[in-house]
Amino acid sequence: RSATALSDPAGLEMVDQPLSEAVQPGQGNAAGGDASFQWLTAAVELVQAGRCHSLVTAPIAKSLWHAANHRYPGQTERLAELTGSPNASMLFTARSPQSGWRLNTLLATTHIPLAAVPQHLNGALVQRKLDKLLAFCQRFNPAPHLVVAGLNPHAGEAGRLGAEESTWLEAALDAWRRQHPEVQLEGPLPPDTCWL
């Protein structure tokens, strides 16, 4: 049912943005990267002007943005700049059409190599992200159930597969729990099974 609704163009206005030069579909180049960048910018301007009510994006080819001299790690950072939101976060949300159950996933880091993730994570960052996730979730449920995934497989297996959970993540979550005793917070849970 939802696939039909999404594919039905009735009531949808398609806004075309001209290209500065021709691009070949399926052939990545700087012109295509620039077009992608300009389209995102124009889409945000349309929403900000009230001509559109929402913005949905797809993944972009960051290498092509860079080829066109647009030096952003990703579109999240460009969206943050355009909207004056320096502390923006990337959040994915889904709701089951059958049960109404909602899953909201907020990322602690974005657009960095996996090897760099441990150096970017710390207790203060995780607590700030939990504050953002709580504020978002409370828009739909005044008493949300929050879960934090561990960084390592099996949430570190008590230090056998990594120490981040035991050296700082557990303490950060305990401190956040003390500040928010009304919130049900679980974690760090094994990231390989916390989605089940």
Language-model-detected regions and their locations in the chain:
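Anion-binding alpha/beta catalytic cores of soluble intermediary-metabolism enzymes, centered on
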Residues: 1-196
